[in-house]
């Protein structure tokens, strides 16, 4: 009846936009793709963060191998062991959080990491509760949210792309369970991530981590489909990076957050290099180096 009378069918129409939801994009526009960025940090600050990210409540019983990983990371922080990939990645996030950058991390197996290198979420072996050290870096840190997602690459990656296009200050990260599985979201990669800026002037700082390796798991687990991303690369629309040392991944992630350029970052993350004895760095490499 209301339709026949030409009356509105909704009780209230929004006449003015909610300006509190507006984002100031000015700081993130007009930058050259190769702009320099200082990703160094005071080594004492880094050592403090290294200690804090390996601290946990006394009453948290951990699985034996996880406890050993944290014990090794304490040795790495003290200089008694070289740093591996997982610890360098954790420190990159910790430094950004300390400086107030929010981080949103989503994927199918990200708390642990596909190849068990990350362990950003610690599980109590008795009551199944969890503890997330990166949420306890400092009192005024940026928000750190981490979500193991449903098994739909297309749905989750599309949502994270949208989130990243409206949240330029922080880092939005999506990790495939295996990089090859990203083809389940190929239409999102083709139509939005690699071409959205050119078509709609929508800049996006989304980071995609694509773990893969030739070590034993066969087809659909081995290449992260690198060739597809290279074919989609044109006019500096995306960054495709293949870091090979812990220091490189540390400075690469810090650069993605610190510098105001917002371009999608596609990371060909490895398997064997996560624990390779020759793929290590020192804490000085993290404090002083660059990507």
Which residue ranges define each predicted feature?
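Flexible, glycine-rich loop/tail regions that form catalytic "lids" or insertion modules at the edges
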Residues: 1-291
């Amino acid at each position: 009846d209301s339709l026949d009378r030409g009356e509105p069918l909704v009780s209230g129409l929004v006449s003015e936009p909610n300006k509190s939801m507006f984002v100031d994009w000015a700081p993130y526009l007009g930058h050259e793709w190769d702009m320099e960025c200082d990703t160094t940090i005071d080594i004492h600050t880094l050592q403090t963060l290294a200690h804090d990210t390996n601290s946990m409540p006394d009453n948290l019983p951990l699985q034996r191998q996880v406890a050993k990983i944290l014990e090794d990371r304490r040795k790495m922080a003290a200089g008694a062991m070289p740093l591996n990939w997982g610890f360098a990645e954790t420190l990159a996030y910790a430094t950004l959080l300390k400086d107030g950058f929010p981080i949103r991390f989503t994927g199918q197996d990200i708390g642990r990491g596909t190849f068990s290198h990350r362990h950003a979420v610690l599980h109590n072996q008795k009551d199944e509760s969890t503890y997330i050290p990166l949420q306890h870096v400092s009192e005024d840190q940026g928000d750190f949210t981490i979500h193991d997602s449903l098994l739909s690459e297309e749905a989750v990656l599309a949502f994270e792309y949208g989130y990243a296009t409206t949240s330029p200050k922080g880092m939005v990260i999506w990790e495939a369970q295996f990089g090859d599985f990203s083809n389940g979201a190929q239409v999102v990669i083709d139509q939005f991530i690699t071409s959205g800026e050119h078509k709609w002037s929508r800049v996006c700082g989304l980071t995609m981590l694509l773990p893969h390796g030739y070590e034993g798991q066969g087809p659909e687990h081995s290449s992260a489909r690198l060739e597809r991303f290279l074919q989609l690369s044109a006019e500096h629309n995306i960054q495709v990076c293949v870091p090979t040392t812990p220091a490189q991944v540390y400075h690469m992630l810090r650069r993605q957050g610190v510098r105001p350029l917002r371009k999608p970052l596609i990371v060909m993350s490895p398997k064997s290099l996560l624990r390779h004895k020759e793929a290590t760095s020192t804490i000085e490499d993290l404090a002083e180096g660059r990507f």
